[in-house]
């Protein structure tokens, strides 16, 4: 009986200690309330892209074409780990369009494809125990705009709905600075097919009927906490 009473006392002490203000926080550091991410890296267009090649006068199909990407995120979190924010992304991918002539200008041309995304997101952030490592995920929906064209100046712009998700891991170098890596995804549904007005302006008009792009990226950069 004495042993049982002692165990009950120990349990009560543990429960009271855990419930005291500040004690739980001292055992498990809180997550930052505000986070800014500045990242750069590589991204891949996972969907099919069709490019007219001036050199052999044919359509070339590309899948998983790499490009350059940058992004900036701002997210605000509650103590529970749930939060909200806004995402801005920019992607650029170049394709070889071959040697040919547009009007009176001959030379090697590149097909340039750029993509902007802006939209709000819902996010969740957590710590790995009491360490300086943190992880976070987010999903959002916003506006995606595309620009495409050849060096000769044939350029088209179109946009539509964008859906994004992101998962990341980061390390806090200090209470205000960290470094991290994000896996990103962007799916966009646009008014033009993914082989579109630039090629139509050159007298080509073919499509696989899929109005949109799917892009995966891996980016790393700076984290700012406040």
Give the positions of each predicted feature.
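Extracellular loop and loop/strand-boundary signature of outer-membrane beta-barrel proteins
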Residues: 54-61, 103-111, 148-156, 203-210
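Cleavable N-terminal export/targeting peptides
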Residues: 1-34
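Outer-membrane beta-barrel channels and translocator barrels
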Residues: 31, 77-81, 91, 127-131, ...
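Predominantly the C-terminal beta-signal and adjacent terminal strand-loop region
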Residues: 49-51, 59, 93-97, 165, ...
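Short glycine/proline- and aromatic-enriched beta-strand/turn motifs that initiate or cap beta-hairpins
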Residues: 25-79, 83-84, 211, 215-226
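Membrane-spanning beta-strand positions in outer-membrane beta-barrel proteins
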Residues: 35-37, 81-83, 132-134, 168, ...
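Residues on the lipid-exposed face of transmembrane beta-strands in outer-membrane beta-barrel proteins
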Residues: 42, 68-76, 88-90, 120-124, ...
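Residues that define the transmembrane beta-barrel architecture of outer-membrane proteins
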Residues: 32-34, 64-68, 112-118, 133, ...
